[in-house]
Amino acid sequence: MTLAIKDGATEIDIVMPLGSMLEGDYETVVDEIQQQKEACGEHDMKVILETGMLQTAKNIKIASLLSMYAGADYIKTSTGKEKPAATPEAAYVMCQAIKEYYDETGIMIGFKPAGGLNTVMDALIYYTIVKEVLGEKWLTNKYLRLGTSRLANLLLSEVIGEEVKFF
């Protein structure tokens, strides 16, 4: 992480310590995330929850809240390597947790669904969840990011009306 920051990284992604989370060792989860945030300094840190491995809405909510209280600037559904990756259900739970955190602290936390966003409709689903649960002030690139490598070309193709292979 230190090397990435020295090389110019302005944001850092970390994966939540899933073993500790699934064992109910929340103190270790918070300690590890806080240590990583300390190493990030002023740089934004995204905590990846791997929601597919968390399996339940309860676990996803707990993981979301622990991450935010430990210093996450964003919470992210997944790396995209595990299946399932992002799901609308997980996104809804995460956005509810962000709203709860915001209502308690006044701090806006970003949200990033990643993995499995393959169509314009997928993007619209996540956009709508964020808009309905969190409100329009979250609909900026500061607070909503879509993690996808294919979607940019699909969106450009939709807008232009012909196939684009820019990215």
Language model segments and positions:
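Alpha/beta enzyme core
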Residues: 1-111, 118-149, 157-167
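Metal-centered catalytic cores of metalloenzymes
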Residues: 153
